[in-house]
A protein has these predicted regions:
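N-terminal flexible/basic segments that precede or flank functional cores
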Residues: 1-50
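Alpha-solenoid HEAT/Armadillo repeat architecture
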Residues: 24, 38, 57, 80-83
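Recognition helices and adjacent regulatory flanks at domain boundaries
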Residues: 48, 61, 103-105
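Short alpha-helical DNA-recognition segment
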Residues: 57-77
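DNA major-groove recognition helix of helix-turn-helix/homeodomain DNA-binding modules
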Residues: 87-104
Length: 108
């Protein structure tokens, strides 16, 4: 019988998994992470969506998916950057996580 080598995870995967673990059960940290992601990457919405996905996984993705009212295929497309979410979808996603979309003036 041939031995199969265990595949090493990439550092990015290890980091993301440890971040998910760190964010579990800490809503203040989840909020700070999302806020920083959006503020520091305002010109790259895909980074914010990846942060939202990370928080959703920290809270339990299956339960999160049910709360959004969106089907899993739609969520997969949004989080894999296959499709830009409609505003309505983004509002549902944030609402399922206990957040809301707000607008503030840019700092000069």
């Amino acid at each position: 019988m041939k031995k199969v080598k265990a595949q090493k995870k990439s550092p990015a995967v290890d980091y993301r998994e440890s971040l998910i673990e760190e964010l579990k059960g800490d809503e203040k940290a989840q909020y700070a992470y999302l806020k920083a992601s959006l503020e520091e990457n305002s010109d790259m919405p895909e980074v914010f969506l990846k942060a939202v996905e990370t928080v959703a996984k920290a809270r339990g993705f299956s339960n999160f998916a049910k709360k959004t009212g969106l089907n899993r295929e739609n969520l997969y497309r949004i989080f894999s950057n296959e499709r830009t979410p409609r505003l309505e979808s983004l509002v549902k996603i944030l609402d399922a996580l206990g957040f809301k979309l707000t607008i503030t003036p840019k700092a000069s």
